A protein has these predicted regions:
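Short catalytic micro-motifs in class I SAM-dependent methyltransferases
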Residues: 126-130
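A conserved beta-strand element that flanks and buttresses the S-adenosyl-L-methionine
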Residues: 123
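Class I (Rossmann-like) S-adenosyl-L-methionine-dependent methyltransferase catalytic domain
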Residues: 1-46, 60-111, 154-276
């Protein structure tokens, strides 16, 4: 099975991003997100006409919750441990959103107390890979308890079959200071570790799984990530046409990307839809 990105949804999300931030008009809102977000939107779209409670975990400056809020009457909650999530309030004002149904919480997800089974929809978008050690399993179990019976849980995360890896960097990361020892940044799962640490740990029922990325040409890996010197100019020129390149190189399949030379940032991953 091979399917392509929903052009209409991608262009709509891109227009939303450009309205929110001038930077996105210049460099796009992220090539990897241009593959990932339309897929999530497509999975949630059948629910848009209902009045639901929605939680996005690890929101940060993501454009997705505000996009959802403009297309639905959902009660939206954005949650992140860092204050950068407060930009969501700026987005809400710019879009004229009803703030009685758009909430921004600055809390560590592992510590915050939320009512069990209180959300109809939960998204976990390229976040779970940043939980160090076995905390990803803890986070999955905790977040699953927040889902109402019959609710929808959509998660995406990097996956590189045959090359699972924990990445450490020599710089400050998400509040962790680099001194002498490299700091954990994120994880690339493989199918086995994803099944064990994400799906099984959640206790939820998997309904659908789709792998995504650049299959025919490693465009993002070779031409966007970690470019130096004059190559940065070429990268920026490519980023200015994020939508065009995502439509050309990105796709969805029933088999995962497997790339021995994959860099730390990747457009390759998995999207799983689960329920209770």
């Amino acid at each position: 099975m091979t399917s392509t990105i929903n052009r209409q949804l991608l262009e709509d999300i891109d227009a939303h991003a450009k309205h929110l931030r001038f930077m996105y008009r210049i460099k796009g809102f992220g090539y990897e997100r241009a593959i990932e977000l339309p897929l999530i939107a497509e999975k949630l779209q059948p629910l848009f006409g209902k009045k639901l409670r929605y939680l996005d975990i690890g929101t940060g400056p993501s454009i997705f919750p505000s996009w959802i809020a403009t297309h639905t009457q959902w009660d939206v909650t954005c949650l992140d441990k860092f204050t950068w999530v407060e930009v969501q309030n700026t987005y809400a004002r710019k879009l004229g959103l009803d703030t009685s149904r758009f909430h921004v919480l600055v809390h560590d997800f592992l510590d915050v107390e939320l009512e069990p089974e209180s959300f109809d929809v939960i998204t976990n978008i390229s976040v779970i890979e940043h939980f160090e050690g076995r905390l990803d399993e803890v986070a999955m179990a905790k977040s699953a308890r927040l889902l109402r019976p019959g609710g929808v849980y959509v998660l995406t995360t990097p996956l590189n079959e045959g090359y699972a890896r924990d990445w450490f960097v020599k710089q400050d990361v998400y509040g962790e200071s680099y001194t002498s020892e490299p700091v954990f940044f994120q994880r690339h799962y493989d199918v086995a570790s994803f099944n064990e640490r994400i799906v099984k740990a959640s206790g939820l029922v998997e309904r659908e799984r789709i792998y995504f990325g650049d299959y025919d040409e490693p465009f993002f890996n070779d031409r966007i990530v970690e470019q130096h010197g004059l190559k940065k100019i070429g990268r920026t020129l490519l980023q200015m046409q994020t939508v065009k390149h995502a439509l050309k190189h990105g796709s969805y399949r029933d088999v995962p990307v497997s790339m021995p030379g994959m860099k730390i940032y990747t457009s390759a991953g998995v999207c799983v839809q689960m329920t209770k």
